[in-house]
């Protein structure tokens, strides 16, 4: 039926900040949906709290609200805008939960707002464990025996009847939060207790474990006329028991017989029809490898991570079509945008294999619990396309950017057999590499399949890769073996290693003998129909389908998988750069490996290459396309690191030149540049070994900040207070980058701020100065940033602007740069300069209304600031106050300490804007899920050096009616200054310690700082962990607590006797 005309205005809810389990795939889905609705002529109102997304750009919807996704604020916007309908299925779990809450509170009925897409009853049936179970029984679809419980005792009783192992799944949580596998009663008690707390409805499902079955997913679509189809099926390399977001996945499924595929396909279609879902839906099934038995695991009645993967794997734009279906269109009326000639009621066919590998944050969290289970831990993922499994798997391995270029981690060769097999059996994030090592040691696929329940088909492929390695080793320079290796996805670098030569020589040999890749098109129909998608992958074969156009082109390098320190912000800058390239009349080509993002949506650029971001893969595209040049400044450290090898190969780097990039990143050159420009920095030195470092620190004086050069997101950065700690740091952390020295700097405790600047080589535009709430020592990505600055004097701001101009001109910056400053006693020091777009670009672009990445790109392509209508210097300030606040994913990462420091830990960000600082802060805290009631108890556990400052905060908390609790030393200090605090016991002091108070719900906030010995703070770690697990606001920086107090004070009344 045609689209609906009885609705005009539609509100779309976004998914909020990026957390583990809910990443950039929702920016992609939301952006697609908004465009899709506007295309049909509807007025679109968007609400999302995440400024780092394309989705929250002004042009995406008719009205964009960057406000907290909470009942209070969404209700306000609904009342103000009065939309006819609400579309919540594109905002992940956040959007769905918000819709449920609005409905339960009667808001939707009161305002007459209709829900589009999927009815609430269907969301309830899919998400509520009990209703789902009833529906499956009605449809006669098998599900594992299970019981809904609301208490720990009920869980223990049920497990006793079906036997262990069992799986615990809390209701209405995201990415398996709070769930897990339990092998015995002790584990069951622990996991269920935590799961019940995390479930908004205090409900868990206890089910029989079917670990070891094959995990298969079907991505299905249905419309209002009951047309339904399968977009794509996918098979997990890892069997059931590991969250699908943490599994390696292949599409299409590889090991099912036709009968099994039809059986599971029918089950998926009957489920989506029974739920009456209109739009996209994801069905997860478990298949017994030894019989035709299967179970339905779960159904996601919304666009999900898997649908982003399915869209990119097939080219079929699920979110775009889900939005069309939501407004009444049917699949047989909508043209498939990929072919431009077939209708969307056409199941995609693939003539290639897609591999997805998750990207984990354990390079940042050395202490994190790496064992995988039913709770998701990956921050992002990579996808690669090839003509066989070996090719797509090896391309995906080198896309991960974890320092490997093959399915091999060289260090594993030294691991003992026993340790190796333990890691093969107990899956961690790097299990693929352990399994590959076991095969290299002669374990057979049969033996490994027995241990891991990974299908023997995949293990045979790993064996095949190993056989090619041996062939290569035995026949150096042999062209036939070289061809075979390239057909199976081997990199030049791996081949060079096996031949004992260099990658350059292998590349030379390939080019001389015309062994070069061809590019194939992703067209949804296995080339059955003509197609017009400019979406390509490389393979070694016959016919090349990517034809170079006559137009001059520019290649933009994306930022690869999302990880801590390099998030969706860089994708944002990439997409904006492409817009500007097109506006300047060039053809824009994107190269990227991340299936979740907007940049890898083929409709964004003129050509998309879905390829690993390595020198070899980029050069292959350059050889074919012969672009005018390559832009590296928007792809984070990933792209910057490719600048030097590309320039050496004669490629034109557009924007800041490699020599100048080096002057900003190389310590000695940078110091020299600052001296020449007469700009102060904290005194520092470089050291290449332990003795040099100790010597440097003695000369500068403790405390010092130590870090390796050339890293992103403060990896392996630490503040050390004495020589013993420094020596232990040099022993454990220096391997962070072996051929680059370690920097030892004087650590200045002061006010930190940062600036993004855009330069055309003569003039410099400074959109704004962002002031950090946390003092220096907390990574800029983990600090709350305020724009415009609230406490900086006019003189300091002028100095910052002056230093910024000098640096941009002195370092020959063309395009963007980011500078971080620290201010102490009105004196400004430069801490670091990044000659590229930084993670604050989207936030600053939105609050100043300057499309910074577009402006920078236009300058890179030859325009000047004055031509674009911008003045030299600091841009006029906004009258509203805007705050960027970090969001963390600690609930998902056991054993990771939530203490903030110089190493970045946040996964996402939110923004709060209002007329005053206090109101903006309130919104930022609410949006980042830090909700403090107006009364309650706050507990202080404070290091000696901060007790004075904490006393002042405690008095203010007491003034607004909070009860004060404190650990022994802190309580004694408070008492000696006339403030009575209720003492709490030491850790392990059964009922009287902080964790037990937290469990009983007697504490509303914890303020915990750590002194000089950051290492020996096990009690503090337990306190912080208990806060995270029970959702109690935790402040590890007094500045953040002070900001929260400002909010509470502005919202409370002080009662005093006269």
Swiss-Prot record:
Protein's pathway: Amino-acid biosynthesis; L-arginine biosynthesis; carbamoyl phosphate from bicarbonate: step 1/1; Pyrimidine metabolism; UMP biosynthesis via de novo pathway; (S)-dihydroorotate from bicarbonate: step 1/3
> Where do the record's region annotations for Carbamoyl phosphate synthetic domain lie?
547-929
In this chain, the stretch annotated as Allosteric domain covers 930-1058
Task: Quote the record's binding site residues for Mn(2+) 2.
Answer: 298, 300
Q: How is the cofactor bound?
A: Binds 4 Mg(2+) or Mn(2+) ions per subunit.
One GO process term, biological-process aspect:
glutamine metabolic process
So where does Mg(2+) 4 get bound?
A: 832, 834
Residues noted as binding Mg(2+) 2 in the record, renumbered to the chain: 298, 300
InterPro entries xref list: ATP-grasp, ATP_grasp_subdomain_1, CarbamoylP_synth_lsu, CarbamoylP_synth_lsu_oligo, CarbamoylP_synth_lsu_oligo_sf, CbamoylP_synth_lsu-like_ATP-bd, CbamoylP_synth_lsu_CPSase_dom, MGS-like_dom
- Annotated residues that bind ATP 2 are located at 707, 746, 748, 752, 777-780, 820, 832
Any one Gene Ontology MF annotation carried by this entry is: carbamoyl-phosphate synthase (ammonia) activity
Cross-referenced PROSITE patterns: ATP_GRASP, CPSASE_1, CPSASE_2, MGS
> Domain named ATP-grasp: which ranges?
133-327, 671-861
Free-text domain note? The large subunit is composed of 2 ATP-grasp domains that are involved in binding the 2 ATP molecules needed for carbamoyl phosphate synthesis. The N-terminal ATP-grasp domain (referred to as the carboxyphosphate synthetic component) catalyzes the ATP-dependent phosphorylation of hydrogencarbonate to carboxyphosphate and the subsequent nucleophilic attack by ammonia to form a carbamate intermediate.
Function as written in the Swiss-Prot or TrEMBL entry:
Large subunit of the glutamine-dependent carbamoyl phosphate synthetase (CPSase). CPSase catalyzes the formation of carbamoyl phosphate from the ammonia moiety of glutamine, carbonate, and phosphate donated by ATP, constituting the first step of 2 biosynthetic pathways, one leading to arginine and/or urea and the other to pyrimidine nucleotides.
Per UniProt, subunit arrangement is:
Composed of two chains; the small (or glutamine) chain promotes the hydrolysis of glutamine to ammonia, which is used by the large (or ammonia) chain to synthesize carbamoyl phosphate. Tetramer of heterodimers (alpha,beta)4.
Q: What is this protein called?
A: Carbamoyl phosphate synthase large chain
């Amino acid at each position: 039926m045609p689209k609906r005309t009885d609705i005009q205005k539609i509100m779309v809810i976004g998914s909020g900040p990026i957390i583990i389990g809910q990443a950039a795939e929702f920016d992609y889905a939301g952006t697609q949906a908004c465009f899709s609705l506007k295309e049909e002529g509807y007025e679109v109102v968007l609400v999302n709290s995440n400024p780092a997304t394309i989705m929250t750009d002004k042009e995406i919807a008719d009205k964009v609200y960057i406000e907290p996704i909470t009942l209070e604020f969404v209700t306000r916007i609904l009342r103000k805008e009065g939309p006819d309908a609400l579309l919540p299925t594109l905002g992940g779990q956040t959007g769905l939960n918000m819709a449920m809450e609005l409905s339960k509170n009667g808001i939707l009925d009161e305002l007459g707002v209709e829900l589009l897409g999927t009815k609430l009853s269907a969301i309830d049936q899919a998400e509520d464990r009990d209703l789902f179970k009833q529906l499956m029984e009605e449809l006669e679809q098998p599900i594992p025996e299970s019981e809904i419980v609301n208490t720990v005792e009920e869980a223990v009783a049920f497990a006793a009847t079906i036997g262990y192992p069992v799986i615990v799944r809390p209701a209405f949580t995201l990415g398996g939060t709070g769930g897990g596998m339990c092998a015995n009663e002790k584990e069951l008690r622990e996991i269920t207790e935590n799961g019940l707390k995390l479930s908004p409805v205090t409900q868990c499902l206890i089910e029989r474990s079917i670990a070891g079955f094959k995990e298969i997913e079907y991505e299905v679509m249905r419309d209002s006329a009951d047309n339904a189809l399968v977009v794509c099926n996918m098979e997990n390399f890892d069997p059931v028991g590991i969250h699908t977001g943490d599994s390696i996945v292949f599409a299409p499924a590889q090991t099912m017989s036709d009968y099994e595929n039809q059986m599971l396909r029918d089950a998926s279609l009957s489920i989506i029809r029974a739920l009456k879902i209109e739009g996209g839906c994801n069905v997860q099934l478990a298949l017994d490898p030894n019989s035709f038995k299967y179970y339905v695991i779960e159904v996601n009645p919304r666009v999900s991570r898997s649908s982003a993967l399915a869209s990119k794997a097939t080219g079929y734009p699920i979110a775009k079509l889900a939005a069309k279906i939501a407004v009444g269109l049917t699949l047989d009326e909508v043209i498939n945008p990929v072919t431009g000639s077939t209708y969307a009621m056409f199941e995609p066919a693939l003539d290639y294999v897609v591999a997805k590998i998750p990207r984990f944050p354990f390079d940042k969290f050395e202490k994190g619990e790496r064992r995988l289970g039913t709770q998701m831990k990956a921050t992002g993922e990579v996808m690669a396309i090839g003509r066989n499994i070996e090719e797509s798997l090896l391309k995906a391995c080198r896309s991960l950017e974890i320092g490997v270029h093959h399915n091999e981690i060289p260090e594993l060769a030294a691991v003992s057999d026993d340790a190796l097999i333990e890691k093969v059996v107990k899956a961690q994030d790097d299990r693929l590499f352990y399994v590959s090592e076991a095969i290299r040691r002669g374990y057979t696929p049969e033996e490994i399949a027995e241990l891991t329940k990974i299908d023997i088909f995949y293990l045979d492929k790993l064996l095949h890769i190993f056989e090619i390695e041996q062939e290569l080793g035995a026949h150096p320079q042999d062209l036939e073996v070289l061809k075979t290796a390239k057909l199976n996805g081997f990199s030049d670098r791996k081949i060079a290693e096996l031949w004992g030569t260099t990658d350059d020589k292998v590349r030379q040999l390939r080019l001389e003998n015309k062994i070069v890749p061809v590019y194939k098109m992703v067209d949804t129909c296995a080339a059955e129909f003509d197609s017009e998608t400019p979406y390509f992958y490389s393979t070694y074969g016959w016919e090349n389908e990517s034809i170079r156009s006559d137009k001059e082109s520019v290649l933009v390098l994306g930022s690869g998988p999302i990880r801590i320190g390099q998030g969706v912000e860089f994708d944002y800058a990439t997409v904006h750069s492409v817009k500007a390239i097109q506006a300047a009349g060039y053809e824009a080509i994107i190269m990227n490996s991340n299936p979740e993002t907007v940049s890898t949506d083929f409709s964004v650029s003129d050509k998309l290459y879905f390829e690993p971001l390595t020198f070899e893969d980029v050069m292959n595209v350059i050889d074919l396309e012969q672009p005018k040049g390559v832009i590296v400044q928007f792809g984070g450290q990933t792209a910057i690191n490719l600048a030097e090898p590309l320039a050496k190969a004669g490629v034109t780097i557009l924007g800041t030149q490699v020599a100048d990039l080096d002057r900003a990143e190389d310590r000695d050159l940078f110091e020299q540049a600052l001296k020449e420009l007469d700009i102060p920095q904290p005194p520092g030195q470089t050291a290449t070994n332990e003795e040099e470092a100790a010597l440097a620190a003695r000369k500068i004086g403790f405390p010092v900040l130590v870090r390796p050069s050339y890293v992103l997101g403060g990896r392996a950065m630490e503040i050390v207070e004495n020589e013993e700690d420094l020596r232990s740091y040099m022993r454990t952390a220096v391997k962070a980058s072996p051929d680059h020295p370690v920097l030892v700097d004087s650590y200045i405790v002061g006010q930190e701020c940062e600036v993004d600047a855009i330069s055309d080589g003569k003039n410099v535009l400074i959109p704004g100065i962002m002031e950090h709430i946390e003092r220096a020592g907390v990574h800029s990505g983990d600090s709350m940033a305020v724009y415009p600055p609230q406490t900086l004097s006019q003189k300091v701001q002028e100095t910052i602007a002056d230093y910024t101009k000098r640096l941009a001109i002195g370092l020959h910056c063309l395009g963007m740069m980011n500078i971080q400053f620290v201010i102490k006693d009105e004196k400004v020091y430069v801490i670091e300069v990044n000659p590229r777009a930084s993670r604050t670009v989207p936030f600053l672009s939105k609050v100043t209304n300057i499309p910074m990445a577009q402006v920078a790109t236009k300058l890179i392509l030859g325009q000047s600031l004055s031509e674009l209508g911008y003045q030299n210097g600091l841009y006029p300030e906004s009258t509203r106050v805007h705050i960027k606040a970090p969001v963390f994913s600690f609930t998902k990462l056991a054993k990771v300490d939530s203490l903030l420091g110089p190493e970045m830990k946040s996964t996402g960000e939110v923004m709060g804007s209002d007329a005053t600082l206090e109101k903006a802060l309130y919104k930022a805290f609410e949006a980042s899920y830090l909700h403090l009631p107006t009364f309650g108890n706050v507990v202080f556990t404070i290091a000696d050096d901060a007790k004075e400052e904490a006393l002042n905060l405690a008095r203010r908390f007491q003034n607004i009616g909070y009860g004060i609790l404190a650990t022994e030393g802190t309580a004694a200090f408070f008492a000696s200054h006339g403030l009575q605090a209720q003492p709490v016991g030491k850790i392990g002091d059964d009922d009287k310690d902080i964790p037990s108070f937290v469990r009983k719900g007697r504490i509303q906030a914890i303020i915990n700082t750590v002194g000089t010995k950051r290492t020996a703070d096990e009690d503090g770690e337990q306190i912080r962990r208990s806060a995270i697990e029970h959702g109690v606001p935790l402040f590890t920086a007094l500045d953040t607590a002070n900001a929260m107090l400002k909010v509470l004070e502005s919202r409370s009344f002080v009662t005093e006797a006269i």
